[in-house]
C-alpha cells in the first residue's frame, strides 16, 4: 500500500502559496492508518527510548497509538494554558512571530530517552523547540520521526545533531 495515495494536497492553506499535506484521508481508512502506525513502528525499531512526545493536535493521532503498540509512555506537548498541572515551556520563532509549547514539569525525568513524533516535518522549528524543552528538563532525544517530511524546506538543517527519519518525503 502506498501511503502517499492517502495524503491530499490542499492549495493555499492555511495561507496563499502554501500547499498543505492533508493526512485526514489516511485516518478515515483503517487499513491505511494501520499501515502508517506499522511503518512508524518499523522506522523506530532500532531506537532506544522509554517515552514518546508529540505536539498537539495531529502529532497525538500518530504518537499515541505508536506508544501503545510499543508499550512506551506518551507525553502530550500542548499550547499554553491547556495542561492542568505545573508546566515547563519553550518559545520559538515562526515565519511571522513566535509560538509557545508546554509540557508538565514532571512528564520527563533526568535520564529519560525520548522519541519525538509528529505528522509533518516542515521547517523543523516545532521539533527543535520540543527537543530543547526535553533536554532542558534532563531528557535525551533518541530520535525524531514524522509521517511526512517536506525536504524542500530543509528541516534537517535545524535538526542537525539529531537522528531524523520520515516515512514519506516530498
Curated annotation (Swiss-Prot):
Homodimer. Catalyzes a salvage reaction resulting in the formation of AMP, that is energically less costly than de novo synthesis. CDD domains: PRTases_typeI (cd06223). It holds the Pfam family Pribosyltran. The keyword Glycosyltransferase applies. SUPFAM superfamilies: PRTase-like. GO terms for molecular function: adenine binding; adenine phosphoribosyltransferase activity; AMP binding. PROSITE patterns: PUR_PYR_PR_TRANSFER (PS00103). The lineage of its organism: Bacteria, Thermotogati, Thermotogota, Thermotogae, Kosmotogales. Its EC number is 2.4.2.7. NCBIfam families: apt, PRK02304.1-2, PRK02304.1-3, PRK02304.1-5. Pathway: Purine metabolism; AMP biosynthesis via salvage pathway; AMP from adenine: step 1/1. It comes from Kosmotoga olearia (strain ATCC BAA-1733 / DSM 21960 / TBF 19.5.1). It is an enzyme of class 2 (transferase). HAMAP family: Aden_phosphoribosyltr. This is Adenine phosphoribosyltransferase. Its main location: cytoplasm. It is found in: Cytoplasm. Keywords: Cytoplasm, Glycosyltransferase, Purine salvage, Transferase. The keyword Transferase applies. Belongs to the purine/pyrimidine phosphoribosyltransferase family. GO terms for cellular component: cytoplasm. It catalyses: AMP + diphosphate = 5-phospho-alpha-D-ribose 1-diphosphate + adenine. GO terms for biological process: adenine salvage; AMP salvage; purine ribonucleoside salvage.
